[in-house]
Design a protein with these regions (language model features):
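Short, extreme N-terminal segment that most often corresponds to the first beta-strand
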Residues: 2-58
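Short edge beta-strands and adjacent turn/loop segments
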Residues: 118-132
């Protein structure tokens, strides 16, 4: 059982805007975006594809569960070709490896964690790309990069536990050796996120990037603070 993410549903994201996004290059750029994914060693490949037209309330025009036979980026692009349109949204799911504190008894393990990647056509949902980006990444749980209860970073601003499970976790972090390990594993996760972000910048004609999360006022600055705290 996951010991310390039961009550922490906040997610972490990356929004990406390209310098130009013509329809005839949409899927080509989507493919380049997908090729940057650092797949989980145990669960490589894309496990789901969904294509919607016009707006979120519309039923998918294409939907396929790929868990039985995960696909690579080129295969996802091939499946999407018949539905190329600037009014469409393309979403895929996959897994990447992050350090998590799980098990019974709980211990640090590098395990597959779900991610979602999205391509927003410029006419989809009244131009939602202007707010969310041409491409989006949902990295998963925010706390895998920021920690719990304000424990990590230079400031270490303590916050009260939000559940008995989190209280138990925070109590265990009162031991210096446990807190040190927590810092190290969280920094490893942050480095993985930043490395992937740099890879995206190198693969695409990026105009702007925004790292953000549901629980942090400045997600990128928070991660940089944790990296700087030694």
């Amino acid at each position: 059982m996951t010991r310390y993410n039961l009550c922490m549903a906040n997610q972490a994201y990356l929004s990406i805007w390209l310098k130009d996004f013509p329809e005839d290059l949409m899927l080509e750029n989507f493919g380049k975006f997908l090729e940057t994914v650092p797949f989980s060693a145990k669960r490589p490949g894309f496990t789901y594809l969904e294509i919607r037209a016009l707006e979120p309330s519309e039923s998918p025009v294409f939907e396929q569960d790929l868990r039985a036979m995960p696909l690579d980026a080129a295969s996802i692009v091939e499946l999407s070709k018949d539905h190329l349109n600037r009014d469409s949204r393309y979403a895929v799911r996959a897994n990447w490896d992050l350090w998590v504190f799980e098990g019974d008894p709980a211990k640090w393990q590098q395990l597959p964690q779900p991610i979602e990647l999205v391509c927003n056509g410029e006419l989809y949902d009244e131009g939602i790309w202007k707010e969310d980006g041409h491409f989006e990444v949902n990295f998963g749980f925010e706390h895998l990069f920021t920690g719990h209860g304000g424990l990590l970073g230079i400031r270490q601003i303590a916050r009260p536990a939000q559940s008995p499970e989190e209280a138990q976790f925070l109590e265990s972090m009162a031991k210096p050796a446990n807190l040190q390990m927590y810092q190290e594993k969280t920094r490893e996760n942050i480095k993985s996120l930043f490395a992937w972000t740099r890879k995206i910048e190198e693969a695409l004609p990026v105009a702007k990037l925004r790292l953000w999360s549901e629980g942090e006022e400045n997600f990128e600055a928070r991660m940089e603070e944790i990296l700087a705290a030694h």
